[in-house]
Amino acid sequence: MMTALSFEATQADFPLPTLGPLLLSIAEDCKRGRGFGVLRGLPVQRWTRIQSLIAYWGFSLYWGRLQHQNEKAHLIGHVKEVVDPTNAKSTTRLYMTRKAQPWHVDASDLVSLLFLKTAKSGGLSGWASSSTIYNEILRTRPDLIPVLAGTWYMDRKKEVPPGKKPYFVLPILNWHEGHLTISWNDTYYQLPPKLYPGEVPPLTPQQEEAIQVWRDTASRPDISINMWLQPGDVQLLQNHNIVHNRSEFEDHEHVDDKRHLLRLWLSPEDARPLPEHFSDLWGGVTPGARGGVGFKTGPEGGVFPLEAEVGQQKL
């Protein structure tokens, strides 16, 4: 684990006179423009792991405050297959497997990925504008808009903050102070009725249909894009109006060659306002201090693991 990187550091501690303005511009475009950006060409193939982590942490100082990505308080996550999908449980987070990840958002204002190594085949990154998906459903199936804005139970995938239930309620469509914030996590809606049948009602036929219509609309080639990202590429996405996915992949045999990405969850201090009910998942709605999972400690108690982990076992 790396713990020396300071949570209280600022851009002045990591000056980037040429690259810094570009990082700020990308973040601004994500927050108030197209919602995503890609930076290409970081020399990760000649950097050590620690150098890559430090450089990526430095980027975060230009984008927002880091938030915990799991109950172990990881502030930089490792997206890597560490669980065989044939043995994975329903509560396993899919980023730890090679299985396809359906359309979803992460529990943060911004999410970033740094590609260290790519898969042997597959593993394409897909993005779609959830605002465009909403507009298309409003045009073709307006009857589903009240359904999407209704009550949806979501599973916490066994990462339950103290005093919370293993599920929570969060509408897909959220209007607040002039913003439409869209929260979409495809597979998280089906689990609570199965795992907690005495507490969570089953999905209604209208909800089942809304899920399928959303999936089909998001996957249309005129709405979504797919990219094959390379080692050294950095992507930054805004979760409130962009959904993303990943195709299934075949990995390399040798452990040193396996697909490996680093991930940041970020909360900018100038992020949009969110309705109070986001607090049940995000631990609050104050920009710069919201998002993530776990909430066992403040972000200043986070760690920077050098490698992917499952439980206490490093892989």
Which residues fall in each region the model found?
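Active-site environment of non-heme Fe oxygenases that use a 2-His-1-carboxylate facial triad
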Residues: 1-19, 24-25, 32, 37, ...
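"Short basic amphipathic alpha-helical interaction patches in structured regions
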Residues: 50-57, 127-129
